[in-house]
Amino acid sequence: MTIGIIGAMEEEVELLKNSMPSVEEIVIGGAKFYVGEIAGKEVVLLESGIGKVNAALGTTLMADRFKPEVIINTGSAGGMAEGLAVGDVIISDRLAYGDVDVTEFGYTYGQVPRMPAFYQGDAVLLKKAETIYREYFAASENKAVYGLVVTNDSFIMRPDQHETIRTFFPDVKAVEMEAAAIAQVAYQFDIPFLIIRAISDLANQEATISFDEFIHLAAKQSATCIIELLKTI
């Protein structure tokens, strides 16, 4: 089984890449693929670049060239739900776009025409994650949270951005810039997927400072959770 893992930034894939005993690097269209093993599993690790287009391009290249049987997205996210803290982990059971609006044509806000309004994380992977992380976080000051992640081609920090997202997605747990695009490509290729992100900021007016300070912590937390999950796949 080949497992695809995708992160947008170097910081988000570095720990996973360093976990590979040997690595083959392949660059296609600016997307950096690292082929090797993690936890005894065949892995294709992608540093896609930031944003929905980069994420969709890289995921499509991964699906077409490397034929992964599972895709997992790692990285950071901005917390939107009450009670979330930096270092908490969000496992997404649903994903949506926060900046797509074709409601004039009868679609739900966030829905791309002829695509589902929400992309569902794989039920089997979600169950595995829930079992693993219940034990993993039992003695930790951080926690794992499950729920809706909303993807935007913007870094969310302003009150007006919050208001728009909460208006259409009142149960949103976190926001970021790639996951729904990865989920859409996985959906179109019929590849099971799971999104595991760690909170780097609280998507508020201090978000840029928090992100710069805590991106490495979030990346480490997310990557560690993924390595634990790989042991069970």
Curated annotation (Swiss-Prot):
UniProt-annotated catalytic positions: E12, D201
Keyword annotations from UniProtKB, A to Z: Amino-acid biosynthesis, Hydrolase, Methionine biosynthesis
Signal peptide (residue range): none
Keyword Chloroplast: no
Pfam families, A to Z: PNP_UDP_1
Binding site for substrate: G78, I156, M177, E178
Entry-linked SUPFAM superfamilies: Purine and uridine phosphorylases
Keyword hit for Hydrolase: yes
Pathway where this protein functions: Amino-acid biosynthesis; L-methionine biosynthesis via salvage pathway; S-methyl-5-thio-alpha-D-ribose 1-phosphate from S-methyl-5'-thioadenosine (hydrolase route): step 1/2
GO MF term set: adenosylhomocysteine nucleosidase activity; methylthioadenosine nucleosidase activity
Residue ranges that the Swiss-Prot or TrEMBL entry lists as coiled coil: none
Enzyme category, top tier: hydrolase
Domain of life of the organism encoding this protein: Bacteria
GO cellular component, one term: cytosol
Reactions catalysed: S-adenosyl-L-homocysteine + H2O = S-(5-deoxy-D-ribos-5-yl)-L-homocysteine + adenine; S-methyl-5'-thioadenosine + H2O = 5-(methylsulfanyl)-D-ribose + adenine; 5'-deoxyadenosine + H2O = 5-deoxy-D-ribose + adenine
InterPro entries per the UniProt record, alphabetical: MTA_SAH_Nsdase, Nucleoside_phosphorylase_d, Nucleoside_phosphorylase_sf
PANTHER family reported for this sequence: 5'-METHYLTHIOADENOSINE/S-ADENOSYLHOMOCYSTEINE NUCLEOSIDASE, 5'-METHYLTHIOADENOSINE_S-ADENOSYLHOMOCYSTEINE NUCLEOSIDASE
Task of the protein: Catalyzes the irreversible cleavage of the glycosidic bond in both 5'-methylthioadenosine (MTA) and S-adenosylhomocysteine (SAH/AdoHcy) to adenine and the corresponding thioribose, 5'-methylthioribose and S-ribosylhomocysteine, respectively. Also cleaves 5'-deoxyadenosine, a toxic by-product of radical S-adenosylmethionine (SAM) enzymes, into 5-deoxyribose and adenine.
Annotated family: Belongs to the PNP/UDP phosphorylase family. MtnN subfamily.
Name assigned to this protein: 5'-methylthioadenosine/S-adenosylhomocysteine nucleosidase
Species whose genome carries this gene: Listeria monocytogenes serotype 4b (strain CLIP80459)
